[in-house]
Amino acid sequence: MTTPLMHSSIKSLKLINQGKVRDIYDIDDRHMLLVASDRLSAFDVILPTPIKDKGAILTQIANFWFEKLKHIVPNHLTGIDPNTVVKDPAEQAQLGPRALVVKKLKPLPIEAIVRGYLAGSGWKEYQASQSVCGIPLPAGLQEAAQLPEPLFTPSSKAEVGDHDENITLEKCAQLIGPELADKVARVSVQLYKEAAAYALGRGIIIADTKFEFGLDEAGELYLIDEVLTPDSSRFWPQDQYQVGSNPPSFDKQYVRDWLESTGWNKTPPGPALPDEVAARTADKYREAFERLTGKPF
């Protein structure tokens, strides 16, 4: 039985960044070590209760998609075993299936969001303006409706604890250049369409998702970070989907619902989760992995 990992401690390498979930260590000028912890954030606040096996599940779901979608765009995987980089047995014990050695690339300063259904902030904006990220949509759409075509709706990257901001396609082009913005939009929609069609066959609707990209020294585009996981996507069970209502998602829904019921003001520090809420959340992550891959975790 694995012990949940809240924070990694790899003293043999230099910690260069700690995100909401991942700890990133410097290996050399071409490689980094990513360690996906069992931290859980909700409402942009990291909660004090870890979710068992979450980091390993996220890493293995992302690896599954990286392999399945590599014909569309190259990715940051190297195939290098983390245990060949980290030699100390106590440090190796923190790695296992949660760790990856990846290419060191220059990340683009945008999140590449693709929406296939009207949900979350997109639904709120549609109600106010009949558009999403400034893109006009037909009248009369209901919550959770499938959009006529998947939409590329980028956002700016925020620091940990801040909210990402939706940006227009014009602003995206200003940030990364029009040619690259067009390529990112095209690749993102292609990734989404292929993944959504596959997932639907496994009983999961991918309502929306967030991709991240980086460039190598030659300017080639790579898919980086995590891909099509319950943390970066809104997964709905197909058998519970109904237009006009917000389906339960395969991620932090139990946690969000419980937090809403506590009256917590959504600012740090977050409250500790009851065992039942943490366990049901862990079950949902595991179910997403098993449904998508067809393998037991």
Swiss-Prot record:
It catalyses: 5-amino-1-(5-phospho-D-ribosyl)imidazole-4-carboxylate + L-aspartate + ATP = (2S)-2-[5-amino-1-(5-phospho-beta-D-ribosyl)imidazole-4-carboxamido]succinate + ADP + phosphate + 2 H(+). Belongs to the SAICAR synthetase family. Keywords: ATP-binding, Ligase, Nucleotide-binding, Purine biosynthesis. HAMAP family: SAICAR_synth. GO terms for cellular component: cytoplasm. Pathway: Purine metabolism; IMP biosynthesis via de novo pathway; 5-amino-1-(5-phospho-D-ribosyl)imidazole-4-carboxamide from 5-amino-1-(5-phospho-D-ribosyl)imidazole-4-carboxylate: step 1/2. Pfam families: SAICAR_synt. It is an enzyme of class 6 (ligase). GO terms for molecular function: ATP binding; phosphoribosylaminoimidazolesuccinocarboxamide synthase activity. GO terms for biological process: 'de novo' IMP biosynthetic process. This is Phosphoribosylaminoimidazole-succinocarboxamide synthase. Its EC number is 6.3.2.6. It comes from the Bacteria. It comes from Methylobacillus flagellatus (strain ATCC 51484 / DSM 6875 / VKM B-1610 / KT). InterPro entries: SAICAR_synt/ADE2_N, SAICAR_synth, SAICAR_synthetase_CS. Gene3D superfamilies: ATP-grasp fold, B domain, Phosphorylase Kinase, domain 1. The lineage of its organism: Bacteria, Pseudomonadati, Pseudomonadota, Betaproteobacteria, Nitrosomonadales.
